[in-house]
């Protein structure tokens, strides 16, 4: 099997405001753009060789991926299945709001106006299965979102519900 690296998008306006982004687009801040450039530089300096960067269609991930691609010379393309989970009516609300915390407790239930954790798992697991079948020798950098990072980690690692809920990556960090 090939290798995967995961990069979460750079800082966004809603990250700063502690709001739930989900499938709603929130642009990168200037700091987020700087983070993306630094990540591209780190990829080059650390000797990471990848065949392709796949990125979420949301601008925060697309812009991050394109900046990394410019810095590293690695070609990139949009992958629609990497879009963040749709949190429905909870999008743009405070991340630490009581209602959202309660709604998150049921993995099987769909967020009102959004998608369930199971729907997200199916989408991401199918993508990873497809990529694995395409080539055993390619290396990919996936640029997406915190919720997607959690789902990718659960694909490769046996995680308890508590470990899954607690897992997260910082903006523009590189995870293998």
Locate predicted features:
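Active-site-proximal alpha-helix that buttresses catalytic centers in soluble enzyme cores
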Residues: 2, 7, 11-74, 115
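Generic enzyme active-site microenvironment
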Residues: 7, 79, 143
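Short, glycine/charged-enriched secondary-structure capping and boundary segments
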Residues: 19-22, 67-70, 91-94, 155-159
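Alpha-helical elements of Rossmann-like donor-binding domains used by nucleotide-donor carbohydrate transfer enzymes
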Residues: 38, 42, 63, 67, ...
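Short beta-strand scaffold positions
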Residues: 55-56, 122, 143-144
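Active-site-adjacent alpha-helix immediately C-terminal to a catalytic or transition-state-stabilizing loop
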Residues: 62, 125-176
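Phosphate-handling substructures
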Residues: 70-125
């Amino acid at each position: 099997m090939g290798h995967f690296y995961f990069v979460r998008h750079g800082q966004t306006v809603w990250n700063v405001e502690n709001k739930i982004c989900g499938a709603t687009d929130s642009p990168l801040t200037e700091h987020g753009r700087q983070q993306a450039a630094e990540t591209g530089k780190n990829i080059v300096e650390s000797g990471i060789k990848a065949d392709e960067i796949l990125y979420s269609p949301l601008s925060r991930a697309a812009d991050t991926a394109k900046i990394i691609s410019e810095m590293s010379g690695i070609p990139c393309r949009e992958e629609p299945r990497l879009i963040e989970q749709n949190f429905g009516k909870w999008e743009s609300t405070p991340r630490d709001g009581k209602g959202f915390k309660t709604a998150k407790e049921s993995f099987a239930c769909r967020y009102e106006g959004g998608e369930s954790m199971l729907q997200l798992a199916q989408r991401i697991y199918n993508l990873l299965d497809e990529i694995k079948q395409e080539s055993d020798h390619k290396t990919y950098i996936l640029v997406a979102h915190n919720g997607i990072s959690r789902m990718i980690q659960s694909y490769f690692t046996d995680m308890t519900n508590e470990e899954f809920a607690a897992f997260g990556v910082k903006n523009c960090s590189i995870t293998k």
